[in-house]
Amino acid sequence: LYFLFQRCQQLGALNQQDLFAQVRVSDYLLEKDRLFARVTLDDAEFGLYEQIYAKLDVQAPKPDLVIYLQAPVDVLLERIAGRGIGYEQYIERDYLVRLNEAYARFFHEFEGAPLLIVNAAAIDPINNPADYDELLAAIRRMKRGRLYYNPLRSKDPFSKR
């Protein structure tokens, strides 16, 4: 519930910002909060979450583009270990499996905005400038609908490089 209220506060502030801003980048959708709640909370807690969410009048701006970075759990675990962020080291594999499945189901049916689904296992835009440039080009090409971005150099769509 803390995260839900925090997101609502952030969205309220976002709605108050300059209406003429050209670009706003966010690393979440409000719907993402519900995914985490469903995976994390037991049934009774999730029921309470749903009741509170239904009472909130959340006016989230519609995104121009949503980017879903998709990767297998093994790749996610490697990246978590490599980042070395303390609290992330305690994330359990089972939790990631459930969360990954929830994301896949959600984005399979998502129609709220243009959607770019990125095979994030095949690229490293943080450490590889060419990957960054190619991903940025794919983002700029994205106008509507749904696009699956899978770099051609990847023989196996979920291979590790």
Region locations from a protein language model:
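Hydrophobic/aromatic beta-strand patches that form the interior of the parallel beta-sheet core
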Residues: 26, 65-67, 116-118
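Residue-level marker of positions within ordered structural domains that often coincide
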Residues: 8-9, 54, 108, 123
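Generic, ordered loop/turn and secondary-structure boundary motif
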Residues: 4, 12, 36-37, 92, ...
